[in-house]
């Protein structure tokens, strides 16, 4: 026998031992039936089960990995220590009155609003903070499109330690006049009370840029180091996150490539197993000795064992014949063929079996035409 064919057969058998599911493909059905007709037993397919096990294991590994990553991220976020001295709990009062911005304002209303504003400032100077709030609110309802009224009321809310109310007033003032420094100053102070260090630094810096104020500048110097520390920590965290994402992308590409290569190897193995069927080395076990009784005319009475068929020209053509293939997949025919191959004198037992004799006639005609 051609040593190359023996090597291919050995590789095929090894592959079947490692992955019996190869034998359970439709292409290998004839081989399963032949093995079983000879009293052999084909191992059950385990590849799928293994794949499911591997999939479950991969899911467990992925879940564990995600948990570890979550813990790492939480650890990275929590390792930032900021001095929160002076930070208070946020106020939860209902939103204050803002006035009707679409109302038609008369000269008299503006004059009255200015009077209310003056009275509110007096109350503020006297330490009557709630009275000042009420008077500023009256002024706002009379002239709701005057930004300074909201900024003044916001300053009182800051003194009352109601930062959220102050922020609402400052937001409204900035909508009306974004070039005024006062709303940014008081919103910055409100953010400082809430521990919003970056927002506080931004607003206070903008207030000083629009109209320098020593009070705003002093608070900016207080909050800026904390804001910078947070920004640096965020950059560090983002950098680590980006590095992790890049690493994960590389790993995903690597796994996809490995999976693709594995699929290619499996496909190649299936193709090889199919081609080995087309020129199955060793032919039928036991060979088919020459001098077939009853004759296989045209074969010269000499068919020195199917072992020699592997190298015979035209073997692929024979095995591609649908009738020959159908006969070879018939357990009854294969048993008879094996019986005759082991003892040619047993041919007489099958003279009346048309399926067996039909196969022998076809092989006789094929090989006879090549002699």
Swiss-Prot record:
Residues 49-72, 255-271 have a biased composition (Basic and acidic residues). Residues 321-360 form the STI1 domain. It is found in: Cytoplasm. One of its GO terms (cellular component) is cytosol. TPR repeats lie at residues 113-146, 147-180, 181-214. Pfam families: HipN (PF18253), STI1-HOP_DP (PF17830), TPR_8 (PF13181). This is Hsc70-interacting protein. The gene is St13.
């Amino acid at each position: 026998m051609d040593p190359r064919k023996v090597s291919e057969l050995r590789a095929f058998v090894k592959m079947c031992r490692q992955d019996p599911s190869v034998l359970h493909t439709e292409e290998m059905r004839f081989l399963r039936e032949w093995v079983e007709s000879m009293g052999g037993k084909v191992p059950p397919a385990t590849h799928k089960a293994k794949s499911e096990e591997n999939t479950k294991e991969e899911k467990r590994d992925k879940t564990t990995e995600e948990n570890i990553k979550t813990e790492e991220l939480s650890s990275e976020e929590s390792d930032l220590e900021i001095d929160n001295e002076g930070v208070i709990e946020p106020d939860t009062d209902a939103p204050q009155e803002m006035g009707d911005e679409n109302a038609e304002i008369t000269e008299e209303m503006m004059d009255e609003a200015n009077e209310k504003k003056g009275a509110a400032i007096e109350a503020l100077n006297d330490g009557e903070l709630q009275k000042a709030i009420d008077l500023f609110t009256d002024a706002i309802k009379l002239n709701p499109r005057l930004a300074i009224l909201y900024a003044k009321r916001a300053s009182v809310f800051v003194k009352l330690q109601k930062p959220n109310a102050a922020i609402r007033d400052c937001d409204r003032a900035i909508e009306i006049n974004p070039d005024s420094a006062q709303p940014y100053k008081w919103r910055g102070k409100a953010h400082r009370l809430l521990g919003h260090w970056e927002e506080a630094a931004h607003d206070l810096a903008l207030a000083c840029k629009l109209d320098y104020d020593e009070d705003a500048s002093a608070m900016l110097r207080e909050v800026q180091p904390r804001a910078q520390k947070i920004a640096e920590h965020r950059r560090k965290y983002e950098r680590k996150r980006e590095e992790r994402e890049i690493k994960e992308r590389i790993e995903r590409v690597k796994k996809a490539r490995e999976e693709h290569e594995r699929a290619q190897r499996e496909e190649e193995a299936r193709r090889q197993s199919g081609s080995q069927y087309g020129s199955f080395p060793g032919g039928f076990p036991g060979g088919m000795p020459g001098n077939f009784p009853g004759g296989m005319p045209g074969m010269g009475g000499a068919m020195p064992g199917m072992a020699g068929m592997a190298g015979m020209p035209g073997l692929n053509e024979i095995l591609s014949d649908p009738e020959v293939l159908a006969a070879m997949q018939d357990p009854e025919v294969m048993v008879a063929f094996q019986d005759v191959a082991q003892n040619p004198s047993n041919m007489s037992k099958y003279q009346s079996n048309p399926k067996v004799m039909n196969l022998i006639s076809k092989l006789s005609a094929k090989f006879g035409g090549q002699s």
